[in-house]
């Protein structure tokens, strides 16, 4: 769906020295992106953030009008209460994160945010985890897919993006509806992911920016 008048803020990060080979390392996930090793060389200078602003008449990246997914205040409160109850039931964010995704040694979870991931089938509500190694999304509800045996099964939609694979983060908003804000994550291999409908948009962006900066500094020291 085309959207008129979008303002973007771009933050670009140098490619890291070492890069994992896949975006979805969790074997339980039905969608897997296999990515070849990046041919880009790591920059030797200190991390630099390049901020740009641009306005476009529209784009067709599968981003939907947030007015269709924007929850009412009562629905937002219910989502927060429901999430809080689930976190308490499982035993904390760390346990939820480790249940959903593979966690490497020394990996630290920073924050978790509720948002939507844009797909060709429409926005999917879920949880976005930001750690010292990756950003990872898991849908709140399971979806129906065909198994290799031809059966219909229900699985959670998962996307895991190593921080060292992220080339830039585009911070966008609809200039006609400033409350509609988006995060586009572009990888060094040309994949792009659109996140929207955040309950805490700016906090999520700041957390991701900090995680990327720390990740670059760690890779540079290795």
Curated annotation (Swiss-Prot):
The record's Gene3D superfamilies line, in alphabetical order, gives: Pleckstrin-homology domain (PH domain)/Phosphotyrosine-binding domain (PTB)
Q: Which organism is it from?
A: Arabidopsis thaliana (Mouse-ear cress)
Q: InterPro entries in the record, alphabetically?
A: GEM-like (IPR037848), GRAM (IPR004182), PH-like_dom_sf (IPR011993)
A matching Pfam family: GRAM
The entry's family comment says: Belongs to the GEM family.
Q: Which residues form the GRAM domain?
A: 95-173
Protein name from the UniProt record = GEM-like protein 4
């Amino acid at each position: 769906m085309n959207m008129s008048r979008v303002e973007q803020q771009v933050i670009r990060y140098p490619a890291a020295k070492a890069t994992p080979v896949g975006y979805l390392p969790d074997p339980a996930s039905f969608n897997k992106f296999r990515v070849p090793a990046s041919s880009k060389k790591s920059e030797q200078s200190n991390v630099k953030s390049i901020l740009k602003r641009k306005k476009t008449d529209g784009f067709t990246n599968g981003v939907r009008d947030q007015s269709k997914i924007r929850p009412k205040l009562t629905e937002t409160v219910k989502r927060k209460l429901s999430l809080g109850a689930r976190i308490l039931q499982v035993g904390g964010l760390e346990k939820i994160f480790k249940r959903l995704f593979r966690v490497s040694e020394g990996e630290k979870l920073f924050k978790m945010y509720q948002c939507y991931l844009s797909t060709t089938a429409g926005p999917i509500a879920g949880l976005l985890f930001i750690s010292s190694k990756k950003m990872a999304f898991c849908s709140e509800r399971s979806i129906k897919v065909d198994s290799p045996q031809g059966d219909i099964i229900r699985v959670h939609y998962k996307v895991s993006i190593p921080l060292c694979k992220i080339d830039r983060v585009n911070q966008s908003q609809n200039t006609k509806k400033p409350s509609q804000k988006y995060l586009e994550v572009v990888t060094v291999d040309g994949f792009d992911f659109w996140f929207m409908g955040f309950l805490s948009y700016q906090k999520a962006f700041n957390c991701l920016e900090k995680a990327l900066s720390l990740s670059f500094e760690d890779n540079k020291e290795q």
